[in-house]
């Protein structure tokens, strides 16, 4: 069986292409508890969504965060809507959040 050799950069780029091509991951709603919620001077919001023993890193850019109707904080239950993509530098996938809602405001 032949093996394909990749540099780390090539492999991360390939995985990014695969995730970007997946329509399901292009528009998802993920529910969980906010953790490590931080707003940076750039206006970008970074947080982790947790559910049971799982976690998902998330980012909400300033342009999307401007439409928030509440002040998010760690410990809140929310629904995050956005797309899953790879951050190639770190080789890690995350949710690029475009909308964040209290779980009670989200559709089941």
Predicted regions and their residues:
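Phosphate-interaction motifs
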Residues: 2-101
């Amino acid at each position: 069986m032949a093996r394909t050799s990749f540099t780390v950069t090539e492999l991360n780029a390939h995985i990014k292409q695969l995730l970007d091509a997946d329509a399901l991951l292009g528009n998802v709603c993920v529910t969980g508890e906010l953790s490590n919620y931080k707003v940076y001077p750039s206006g970008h919001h970074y947080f982790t969504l947790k559910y049971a023993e799982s976690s998902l890193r998330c980012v909400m850019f300033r342009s999307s965060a401007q439409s928030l109707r509440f002040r998010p904080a760690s410990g809140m239950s929310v629904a995050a809507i956005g797309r899953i993509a790879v951050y190639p530098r770190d080789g890690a996938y995350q949710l690029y959040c475009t909308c964040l809602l209290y779980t009670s405001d989200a559709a089941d």
